[in-house]
Amino acid sequence: MATEKNTLLSLILTAGITALVATGQKAEQPEVVTNYGSVRGYQVKVNAAERSVNVFLGLPFAKPPVGPLRFSEPQPPEPWKGVRDAASYPPMCLQDKVLGQYLSDAITNRKEKVRLQISEDCLYLNVYTPVSTEEQEKLPVFVWIHGGGLVSGAASSYDGSALAAFDNVVVVTIQYRLGIAGYFSTGDKHARGNWGYLDQVAALQWIQENIIHFRGDPGSVTIFGESAGGVSVSALVLSPLAKGLFHKAISESGTAVRILFTEQPEEQAQRIAAAAGCEKSSSAALVECLREKTEAEMEQITLKMPPMFISASLDGVFFPKSPRQLLSEKVINAVPYIIGVNNCEFGWILPRMMKFPEFTEGLEKDVARQVLQSTLALSFKGAPSDIVDLVYNEYIGVAENRAQVRDGLLDSIADPLFVFSAVEVARHHRDAGNPVYFYEFQHRPSSAAGVVPEFVKADHADEIAFVFGKPFLAGNATEEEAKLSRTVMKYWTNFARNGNPNGEGLVHWPQYDMDERYLEIDLTQKAAKKLKERKMEFWMQLTEQIMSDRRRKHTDL
């Protein structure tokens, strides 16, 4: 294994990309005065980019959301005197610590693994800003929103130094309350919910007020995120609370329709109440009971819940109407938008997290049908058996062996959760007159060899390594992958600067139009159109049928 790694490193070195590791030496201790007080960070050298980056970790953008502030809107942070140390990673928000660490280790773009603590006091952000010896214009700002199903994840899993160094941008990674602390709702005034989304708005407000001190341009902010982070970006594009706080948006493998949203949060609240021993006769009493739980008790309640146990909800504040209604009524923050998916979204990491039956060698049809029935509920709540039949016949019915059954099942889950949802949102934004660029990421990382089964192509989250320049920080990549990473970083940063990803030396990325043109991103890139056209038509018709059935039932009542 070590020999293979050395070979890969030498391949990259011979391509003229030197010393892949940001040194981490704290030779320089940069200080910045923010609106709340002074902070002292440290400097790293990204040798491959021949540039240093100033790093500031754990900057508070809100008061700790503890005690009476649990299930409350975030409040501005308290100012401090003296110089605050900003050289240590903040704790990640309350979550299943084992799952959170597993996800962090799986997706980090660093060479080393960062051991993360958990705490309810977690509303912090990290800033990476390139060093310059001369006064320059203000730099575009990237704000990364991590994924993790709204129940796990951490800002510190993502090192923004390579992106900042190579492309002369400021990178901010933010945290937000997760799980019960982040999205618990009683569906009324006692706990409206969406606390995590309100935290994201608070972080963006802090950035508007303070990023100028880090050479960032508050008038050029691009929000981007993956999975639940992509859903969050999509939600912020729809929320009136976020209007004017950002200027471009990128959703990677996640949009705010069909997943991680409910119009009936009371059902979630009842399950949480039962797990917490807080089954009360009123919403007010339930909220008070949960507020009295210690942090350790909240962690134990979280561990009793299934993997994807909570969603954002219709609160009348962050979401005045459902995401689908806001989209259809074109009530959208008008910004250029990149939306994309990977070509094997439900290939490996998500089925494992959701404790799928062993599927590596294939599946029997009866097992696949049972799994399909349970997972369809993620996309279509209360899907009747005839809907299950239609999806089964479309994806699995014609399969001739266990491997084809497995592949059909995985696609039947990925397509509605990720692909069709992304296409739907892209169409709405296009029709509202906003510039949209769509992609499908197709590259299976070389680091997957011997770890991820060969049938998995570009799995959920695989693109993150290339967006954040992992080949230049962690190595373990081929020369072609280093080139791909630079290509993706250039597309993203061109978009942040100009609202258009295209630039010199890049394959032309067409705007998403009525021909639904998009970019296939692999070791080489090419334009294509109408991603999965037949399957998308299938899901469009099925969605219309389900909504028509619901309207008819509602009318009958």
UniProtKB/Swiss-Prot annotation:
The keyword Disulfide bond appears for this protein: yes
UniProt keywords, alphabetically: Disulfide bond, Fatty acid biosynthesis, Fatty acid metabolism, Glycoprotein, Hydrolase, Lipid biosynthesis, Lipid metabolism, Signal
Tissues/organs with expression: Highest levels in uropygial gland, much lower in liver and kidney.
Query: Where are the disulfide bridges?
Result: C93-C122
What GO MF terms are annotated?
hydrolase activity
Q: Which Gene3D superfamilies match?
A: alpha/beta hydrolase
> InterPro entries annotated for this entry?
AB_hydrolase_fold, CarbesteraseB, Carboxylesterase_B_AS, Carboxylesterase_B_CS, Type-B_Carboxylest/Lipase
Coiled-coil segments, which residues? none
- Any GO BP: fatty acid biosynthetic process
- Sugar-bearing residue positions: N476
The answer to whether keyword Lipid biosynthesis applies is yes
Enumerate the active-site residues: S227, E345, H460
What is an example of a Pfam family matching this protein?
Answer: COesterase
| EC class name | hydrolase
Q: Would you indicate the residue range of the signal peptide?
A: 1-25
Role, per record: Fatty acid biosynthesis chain termination and release of the free fatty acid product is achieved by hydrolysis of the thio ester by a thioesterase. This thioesterase may be associated with peroxisome proliferation and may play a role in the production of 3-hydroxy fatty acid diester pheromones.
Protein family according to the UniProt entry: Belongs to the type-B carboxylesterase/lipase family.
* Name recorded for this polypeptide: Fatty acyl-CoA hydrolase precursor, medium chain
- Which organism is this protein's natural source? Anas platyrhynchos
